[in-house]
Each structure stands twice: as structure tokens, then as C-alpha cells.
Amino acid sequence: VLSSADKANIKATWDKIGGHGGEYGAEALERTFLCFPTTKTYFPHFDLSHGSAQVKAHGKKVADALALAAAHLDDLPSALSALSDLHAYKLRVDPVNFKLLSHCLLVTLAAHHPAEFTPAVHSDLDKFLSSVSTVLTSKYR
């Protein structure tokens, strides 16, 4: 459960990300593909090379979904319902991959915003990403 302080940190972080969301999303995806090569199996039709237009486009989709989630912290299930359906019923993404991408996104954010990435912000973002992952995998059951 996200506290009011957690929510404030999450919203403040997403405000700081601003127009860099797509860039950070793509970088997090690249990190995920490099560190956890099995995640590439879900993207056989993508050019997964550094700077690929397809990875950049998907990174923007990831960032946009997280921005939507950050704007609807009090009702993540409704905000992410369509995305949950897509990942559970059509794409059938292994739930562990959400945790791997979340980890790589935290690393990316820490690398770009080291001063703002305090232990409290790290913890709050980790809780947020875990909540998003839980919602995205809720329809697998």
C-alpha cells in the first residue's frame, strides 16, 4: 500500500522525468535485454540493437504507461486494465519480466538523477513499480 508520502515522491519523480520518459524507458529496455537475455524472446520481430527505433518506440510506451499509473495511484487496476489484459491474454509475458524491467528502470533513473534518488525515493519507486507489476499480472490468475 502506498502512503501519501510514497505517492508524493512518485509524482515528484515522474514530474522530474518530464520529456525524458521515452528515453529512459528505452534505456531500461536495453539494460533489460543486455542483463537478462531471455527477455528478448518476447520481441523476435524487433531490431534490439542499441538505439533501435523499435526499442525507442516501445520504451516510450512503457514510460507512457508508467506516467498514466503515476497519475492514477489511487486506482491502478482501472488505469491499467487494458494493459493488463494485453499482457495476460495476448502477449502472455512471464510475470518475472516485469520485475526485471522494474529493476533496470530503477538503475536507469538512479543513473540519470543521482542527487534525487535518495533511499526514500528508491523505496517508493520500488513499491510503485511492484504495484504496477502486481496489477499487470493480476489477470494471469
From Swiss-Prot:
Red blood cells. CDD domains: Hb-alpha-like. The modification N6-succinyllysine is found at K7, K11, K16, K40. InterPro entries: Globin (IPR000971), Globin-like_sf (IPR009050), Globin/Proto (IPR012292), Hemoglobin_a-typ (IPR002338), Hemoglobin_oxygen_transport (IPR050056), Hemoglobin_pi (IPR002339). O2 binds at H58. Residues 1-141 form the Globin domain. The modification N6-acetyllysine is found at K16. Heme b binds at H87. It holds the Pfam family Globin. PANTHER family: HEMOGLOBIN FAMILY MEMBER, HEMOGLOBIN SUBUNIT ALPHA. This is Hemoglobin subunit alpha. It comes from Crocuta crocuta.
